[in-house]
Amino acid sequence: MRSLLAQGFMGSQRGRRKVALAMVATLGALLAGCGTALPTGDGRTPQHIDITLIGFNDLHGNLEPPHMAHRVQGPAGPVLAPAGGMAYFASAMAALKAQSPHHAVVSAGDMVGASPLVSSLFLDEPTIEAVNRMQIDFNAVGNHEFDRGWRELLRLQHGGCEKFTSREPCRISKPFEGAQFGLLAANTVREDGRTLLPATGIKRFTDGGVTVTMGFIG
């Protein structure tokens, strides 16, 4: 299994939790792969599935390209590249997906919050809708997903136009349909002990009679 990190929004890597989702997903896929590698009993080579794991974090609603170049690691060393913005990011994501029919796309948090005006003015609904079009699987919420409170975070997941902040929701799309990918939060619990959002997510891959189950912990 290959693990690929989209570099456009890796940012400052603010803590170990940012990479926890991708690391656990990688481990889960490897363990799942071990289940398919058992001997067949008749001497045949065991079948397997190649899975590409694509991860990113700290998008922070950066829908537009920045006004400066970013330092990225090129084949010959660091170079300055005029990259960024959702259009470039979505194109890079599509290219990675095209390389593997079996893939999972995960975000390790801070997809929204601390966002530029183009997203924050509309309660980050534009960012959720843009990421919906990219068809990712899960986002493990970070601290900035809670910038407007947990009720507003649930609205971003489930949709709707109920007002939880001083700004009016649904000013672009009415009704706002919410994220079409799962938000995960294993370490955020309600007073009754239930997690605010699902703690885990599962994606299954099937090819040639072989099924691999990949688990994600938010």
Regions found by a protein language model. Give the residues of each.
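Bacterial N-terminal signal peptides
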Residues: 22-31
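Bacterial N-terminal signal peptides that target proteins for export
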Residues: 4-23
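Acidic, metal/ion-coordinating pockets
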Residues: 34-218
